[in-house]
């Protein structure tokens, strides 16, 4: 049934057409979806070579309207910083005992991990577990910090991390299908502006090669990458 629905949805998408961002989002919202609130995603192909250190594009941004998802945050901290994390709304706070749960019991009930710098000797041992899942705390993404309270609050409000994959593509969440089109658009243009700001100096020519929007169970819709604002 799901396969038939996807085929019907694909038939409504003009494969060779470049939709404006608004048109693409309106189309995705019109299509019959799954029985849950699907996630709307953006896939942005950049003209970069991720194998070169001077062309790695990564960072974080606050989506103006959030992601629509409640993210569970684990914090590695002790003492006053542990209390600060708890007060900010962290779901799990610990140190050696949290690392042991992850390492020995396979505990992975969180979406983001944050750590104070002094905890990285402990967290480092979890690299083979957290790394492949994209959960390893990193200073560049603001998840290795002494300001754990602020980090937790921002993540809870909709801060997302972006990073090009080996093909030079950014995959990120724009929100939920239940969001209105204007909210999704605002999130997309915030992402686009952030990627333009993060453009490596070494990149020549056209920077954003292509853009596509999709939903969890829906088709991909090609988007005109030149549109900066609607």
From Swiss-Prot:
Function: Binds directly to 23S rRNA. The L1 stalk is quite mobile in the ribosome, and is involved in E site tRNA release.
Top-level division of the source organism's lineage: Bacteria
GO terms assigned for molecular function: rRNA binding; structural constituent of ribosome; tRNA binding
Family designation: Belongs to the universal ribosomal protein uL1 family.
Quaternary context: Part of the 50S ribosomal subunit.
GO biological process, one term: regulation of translation
Gene Ontology CC: one annotated term: large ribosomal subunit
Gene from which the chain derives: rplA
Cross-referenced SUPFAM superfamilies: Ribosomal protein L1 (SSF56808)
Name of protein: Large ribosomal subunit protein uL1
Keywords, sorted A to Z: Repressor, Ribonucleoprotein, Ribosomal protein, RNA-binding, rRNA-binding, Translation regulation, tRNA-binding
């Amino acid at each position: 049934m799901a396969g038939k629905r996807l085929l019907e949805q694909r038939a409504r998408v003009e494969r060779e057409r470049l939709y404006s961002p608004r048109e693409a989002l309106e189309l995705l919202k019109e299509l019959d979806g799954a029985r849950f609130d699907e996630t709307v995603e953006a896939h942005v192909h950049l003209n970069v070579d991720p194998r070169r250190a001077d062309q790695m594009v990564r960072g974080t941004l606050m989506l103006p309207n959030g992601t629509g998802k409640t993210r569970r945050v684990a914090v590695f901290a002790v003492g006053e910083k542990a209390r600060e994390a708890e007060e900010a709304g962290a779901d799990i706070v610990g140190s050696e005992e949290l690392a042991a749960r992850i390492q020995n019991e396979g505990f992975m009930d969180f979406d983001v991990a944050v750590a104070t710098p002094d905890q990285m000797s402990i967290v480092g041992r979890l690299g083979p577990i957290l790394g492949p899942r994209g959960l390893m705390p990193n200073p560049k993404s603001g998840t290795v910090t002494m300001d754990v309270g602020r980090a937790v609050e921002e993540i809870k409000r909709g801060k997302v991390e972006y990073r090009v994959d080996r093909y030079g593509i950014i995959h990120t969440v724009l929100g939920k299908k239940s969001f209105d089109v204007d909210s999704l658009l605002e999130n997309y243009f915030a992402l686009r502006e952030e990627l333009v700001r993060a453009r490596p100096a070494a990149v020549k020519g056209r920077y954003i090669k292509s853009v596509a929007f999709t939903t969890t169970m829906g088709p991909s819709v090609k988007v005109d990458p030149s549109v900066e604002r609607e």
